[in-house]
From Swiss-Prot:
NCBIfam families: yopT_cys_prot. Potential cysteine protease. Avirulence protein, which may be essential during infection of plant cells from Pea and some Arabidopsis thaliana cultivars. May act by affecting the plant defense system. In plants lacking appropriate resistance (R) gene, it probably impairs the plant defense system and leads to the bacteria multiplication. In contrast, in plants containing the appropriate R protein, it is unable to induce disease symptoms, explaining its avirulence name. It comes from the Bacteria. Disulfide bonds: none annotated. Signal peptide: none annotated. The keyword rRNA processing does not apply. Keywords: Hydrolase, Protease, Thiol protease, Virulence. Residues 13-27 have a biased composition (Polar residues). It is an enzyme of class 3 (hydrolase). The keyword Hydrolase applies. This is Probable cysteine protease avirulence protein AvrPpiC2.
Length: 269
């Protein structure tokens, strides 16, 4: 998760990652194939039944004595890079191997480096946009930063969803409000799922209040099955027809209401 407001610049940048002493076993990330380990965040039944492997960006760094810091954009881009490289086998074994690499010291360093580039670019663009502050400026800066960070991985991302409410936001509004009640806009959620299935591979971003959270996605060639990687929870495989429910369950498990969404279609340069 990344803060998309002007406060992002207040986080110090890490240009290098150094290993220190590992945290106690109780605070370390378990093996991604061991679903029953009590250190994992508990999943709702709807997600646990489609889980291929587990992951948690908040504790994987503990295994290497590295300070915790959100790196969902870096992890999602690393995951998509593996998918493009042909490592897209949809089996619990292959999924666990992908998660093990992402959680390894090398995987964390790669993800943190890319995410730090994203964070630094975002800070720079936010400073440029300071003359016109607001959610729109922050979101635009975040979009451009993600596109540039993807270039480091040899990926070309293209945002495909467009908000039609003249809000000026570079994402699709995914909620509707009735009085004090805010609920998911089913039409927007349907557009999100259609974009994922149509574009096959890429990064999905959830915009929730002042937080942006990135997930990777990959869809089978026939469009019938989808794999989602959430850096907070792990890898999930579902029928495309159940994609909307899966995304809602993930956002609920993450505690991130779907305020806005964007799909960044991914291609290799």
């Amino acid at each position: 998760m990344t803060i998309v407001s002007g406060h992002i610049g207040k986080h110090p940048s890490l240009t290098t990652v150094q290993a220190g002493s590992s945290a106690s076993v109780e605070n370390q990330m378990p093996d991604p194939a061991q679903f029953s380990d009590g250190r994992w965040k508990k999943l709702p039944t709807q997600l646990s039944s489609i889980t291929l492997a587990r992951f948690d960006q908040n504790i994987c760094t503990n295994n290497h004595g590295i300070s915790q810091r959100a790196m969902c954009f870096g992890l999602s881009l690393s995951w998509i890079n593996m998918i493009h490289a042909g490592k897209d086998h949809v089996t619990p074994y292959a999924s666990a191997e992908r998660m093990r690499f992402l959680g390894s010291f090398e995987g964390v360093v790669h993800a943190r480096t890319v995410h730090n580039f994203y964070r630094t670019e975002h800070k720079f663009l936010m400073e440029q946009a300071s003359a016109n502050p607001g959610v729109s400026s922050g979101a635009m800066a975040g979009t451009e930063s993600l596109l540039q960070a993807a270039e480091l991985k040899g990926l070309k991302l293209q945002p495909v969803l467009e908000d039609k409410s003249n809000s000026g936001l570079p994402f699709l509004i995914a909620c509707k409000q009735s009085g004090r009640q805010v609920s998911t806009d089913e039409a927007a959620l349907s557009s999100l799922c259609d974009a994922i299935v149509e574009n096959k591979r890429g990064v999905m971003v959830i915009y929730s209040q002042e937080i942006a959270h990135a997930l990777g996605f990959s869809v089978s060639s026939d469009g019938k099955r989808a794999t989602l990687f959430d850096p907070n929870l792990g890898e999930f495989h579902t029928h495309s027809k159940a994609l909307a429910d899966t995304i809602e369950n993930i956002s609920s498990a993450d505690g991130l209401p779907l305020i806005g969404v964007q799909v960044f279609a991914s291609k290799i340069h």
